């Protein structure tokens, strides 16, 4: 077995470091083998080394190796070089007009580039070339949602359960699934969580609509959200994810409820606030924060766990802290910090209470004492928005989540929210705008 074959085995086992070493050794013997250069390139992309991967694709692209053109476009897209990625994907389906992945990637890049309406035709072509591909269906669904066509977007949103999987990851529960057509007066409906914390906070309002329709509702939620939902949904039964499931007539996923109710952008239920904390929690934080002499502003810079897309969302802490001044009392809302972060926060006189933020109910208590929250796209603005606390969200110009829609500085989900969008890939103009608005806020 040669190094090329051994590298392929490592790659299939997701042992990317070992695979790259094998490919490099093989290329020392056959430096013009463009197929091996391609394999090294896709391996480096898996390791997050997209710039190095682009160099590997040069030789196979010169040979018009279609998969290298596709992989080159994917690497460019990962780097946020959307214009170059579009050109590369277009070259891919010019070489192979039936390459459905090239059309899908072209459409996805258009959507991330802020052009979801242009993305949809290419995503439809991908589905025509490969019928039944649920990832292509999900891409089309998200494009409709991003441009604000919620009714159309919900139709194929079921495909999310197949994201990066060949089988549905949807929980297989016994009994019928609620789809909005059944009479649920007096019926027991089980609602179970999915996706991230922000999704649960944003969409929990739809569970209350079930109650309004006469159902007895049980919510299954993540432990970190249990106390928050338990307090705010006294008319519903709230259970932890590990609790024994009680009898029910119907079950439904939380984020399927908007489809069940034919929710459009102008019929989103329960305007904020719909979440709060009890007086005891508020009093705890009043004492913890001490006497109030200035308006308080809560800050959050970057997600605690950095995922692929978060490289575009995040902002360096010191960048965000450039908006601080002596005119306000600034408070960090992050619950995961290290010594370096603590030193930086202290340098800018930002208070931190990370040791007291053990769950979202505690975090909500701290947020309840803020006059304003400024954050990038994480669970925090969803939480503060649901509480009715004035919230300013900083968004990238490319790659933003669909729920912030397009070309608007407000949110139909939260009437207390203002959106600050990049226009040139830089946070500096956004931060400058926020500095000016803070002068008026006081």
Residue ranges with predicted function:
Residues 1-372, 377-442:
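Alpha-helical solenoid repeat scaffolds of the TPR/TPR-like class and their adjacent stem/linker regions
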């Amino acid at each position: 077995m040669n190094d090329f074959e051994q590298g392929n085995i490592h790659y299939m086992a997701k042992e990317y470091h070992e695979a790259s070493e094998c490919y490099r050794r093989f290329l020392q013997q056959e430096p013009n083998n463009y197929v091996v250069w391609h394999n090294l390139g896709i391996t480096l992309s898996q390791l997050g080394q997209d710039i190095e991967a682009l160099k590997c694709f040069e030789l196979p692209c010169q040979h018009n190796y279609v998969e290298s053109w596709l992989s080159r476009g994917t690497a460019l897209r990962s780097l946020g070089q959307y214009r170059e990625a579009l050109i590369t994907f277009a070259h891919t389906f010019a070489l192979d007009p039936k390459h459905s992945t090239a059309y899908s990637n072209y459409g996805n890049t258009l959507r991330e580039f802020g052009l979801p309406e242009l993305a949809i035709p290419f995503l439809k072509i991908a589905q025509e070339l490969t019928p039944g591909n649920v990832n292509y269906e999900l891409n089309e669904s998200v494009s409709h949602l991003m441009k604000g066509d919620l009714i159309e977007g919900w139709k194929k949103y079921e495909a999310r359960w197949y994201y990066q999987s060949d089988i549905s990851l949807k929980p297989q529960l016994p009994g019928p699934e609620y789809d909005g057509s059944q009479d649920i007066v007096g019926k027991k409906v089980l609602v179970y969580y999915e996706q991230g914390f922000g999704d649960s906070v944003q969409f929990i309002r739809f569970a209350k609509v079930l109650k309004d329709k006469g159902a007895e509702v049980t919510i299954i939620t993540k432990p970190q959200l249990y106390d928050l939902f338990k307090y705010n949904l006294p008319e519903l039964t709230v259970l932890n994810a590990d609790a024994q499931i009680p009898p029910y007539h119907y079950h439904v996923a939380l984020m399927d409820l908007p489809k069940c109710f034919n929710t459009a952008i102008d019929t989103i239920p329960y305007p904020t606030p719909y979440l709060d904390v009890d007086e005891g929690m508020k009093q705890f934080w009043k004492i913890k924060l001490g006497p109030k002499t200035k308006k308080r502003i809560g800050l959050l810079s970057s997600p605690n766990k950095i995922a692929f897309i978060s490289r575009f969302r995040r902002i360096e802490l010191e960048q965000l802290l450039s908006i601080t001044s002596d005119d306000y009392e600034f408070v960090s809302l992050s619950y995961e910090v290290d010594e370096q972060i603590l030193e930086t926060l202290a340098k800018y006189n930002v208070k931190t209470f990370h040791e007291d933020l053990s769950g979202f109910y505690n975090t909500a208590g701290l947020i309840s004492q803020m006059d304003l929250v400024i954050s990038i796209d994480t669970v925090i603005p969803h939480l503060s928005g649901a509480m009715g606390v004035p919230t300013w969200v900083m968004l990238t110009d490319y790659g933003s989540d669909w729920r912030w829609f397009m070309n608007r500085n407000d949110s139909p989900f939260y009437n207390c929210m203002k959106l600050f969008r990049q226009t040139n890939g830089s946070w500096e103009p956004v931060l400058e705008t926020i500095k000016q608005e803070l002068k008026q806020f006081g």
